[in-house]
Design a protein with these regions (language model features):
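Nucleotide/pyrophosphate-binding catalytic subdomain
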Residues: 1-142
Length: 142
């Protein structure tokens, strides 16, 4: 088995993700593989900035979510043609959970290391879900 790890700049945009999927496709013809992807470029930084901003101003944190959401929806639009609604619904659900965390930070006026870790995990949850769906579509041979 081969493990392939792709960092943030490797999955920063749809063109780079297409290159990653081509590498995955080629590698999977040789052996079984596991793929690990980071959050899309700068997403983790933006998520953490949003959490820190939520301490002071929830509206700024909400704007940061919208900026991150826009990038993710653009990538979905460029990579996924089938079951798009399901992908949008799941991604929206993740963003709604993130917003709830930001609102909790604002209301409690508390941002622990545990909460920061939880917030930063959303980048990988989002990117891995989107890339997995793009791969399913690309590699579907039926």
């Amino acid at each position: 088995m081969k493990v392939l790890k792709f960092g943030g700049s490797s999955v920063a945009n749809s063109e780079n993700i297409k290159k990653v999927l081509a590498i995955v496709s080629a590698a999977s013809k040789e052996t079984k593989i596991a793929v690990i992807v980071s959050a899309f470029g700068k997403t983790t930084d933006n998520l953490l900035a949003g959490a820190n901003n939520a301490l002071q101003d929830i509206d700024i944190a909400k704007q940061q979510i919208e900026t991150i959401k826009k990038l993710h929806f653009e990538i979905i639009n460029e990579l996924i043609q089938t079951n798009t609604l399901e992908v949008y619904e799941k991604v929206n659900s993740l963003f709604n959970r993130l917003l709830s965390i930001y609102e909790g930070i604002f209301l409690l006026q508390e941002l622990s290391d545990k909460t920061l870790a939880k917030v930063s995990s959303f980048g990988e949850k989002l990117s891995s879900f989107i890339i997995a769906n793009a791969a399913k579509e690309l590699f579907d041979t039926t």
